[in-house]
């Protein structure tokens, strides 16, 4: 092998080396572009998944709030019903006590006071009747038929 052949071989190996380097650069550039595009797609997909997850969380939270509000409303209605029942029972008891008290006070506190005068042919009556807090005054002149 002569010096010319050596230079041809070195030129050829240099050309092969440059071609390999260039092909490697092209492949690396293509891989870099593919990796960047894949990274962009992955970022977009993560955002989509995060939005879906946030939407699901929001729906679950709204459902929970709705359930809680319904439970609170139902509890308040039940409490109101219990209080109303108790109030009605107490009101009926008060009415019964009032009826008996009024009956008792009317029947136990009757006070009758009266005067009468008999003059010639008429009878003068003055009566005062007290029923508890109420008073009634009666004054009447009654003519008497006398047989002569």
Swiss-Prot record:
UniProt GO MF annotations: calmodulin binding
Q: In which domain of life is the source organism classified?
A: Eukaryota
Task: Name the coiled-coil region(s).
Answer: none
All copies of the IQ domain together span: 11-40, 67-96
The name of this protein is: IQ domain-containing protein F5
Repeat in keyword set: yes
What is the organism field in this record? Homo sapiens (Human)
Keyword tags: Repeat
User: Which Pfam families did the record assign?
Assistant: IQ
State the organism's lineage: Eukaryota, Metazoa, Chordata, Craniata, Vertebrata
């Amino acid at each position: 092998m002569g010096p010319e052949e050596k230079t041809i071989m070195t030129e050829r190996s240099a050309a092969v080396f440059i071609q390999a380097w260039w092909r490697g650069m092209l492949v690396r550039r293509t891989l870099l572009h593919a990796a960047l595009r894949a990274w962009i797609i992955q970022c977009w997909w993560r955002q989509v998944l995060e939005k879906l997850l946030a939407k699901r969380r929001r729906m679950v939270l709204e459902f929970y709030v709705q359930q809680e509000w319904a439970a609170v409303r139902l509890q308040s209605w039940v409490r109101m019903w219990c209080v109303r029942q108790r109030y009605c029972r107490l009101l009926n008891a008060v009415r019964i006590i009032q009826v008996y008290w009024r009956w008792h006070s009317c029947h136990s506190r009757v006070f009758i006071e009266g005067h009468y005068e008999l003059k010639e042919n008429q009878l003068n009556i003055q009566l005062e009747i007290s029923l508890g807090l109420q008073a009634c005054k009666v004054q009447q002149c009654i003519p008497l038929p006398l047989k002569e």
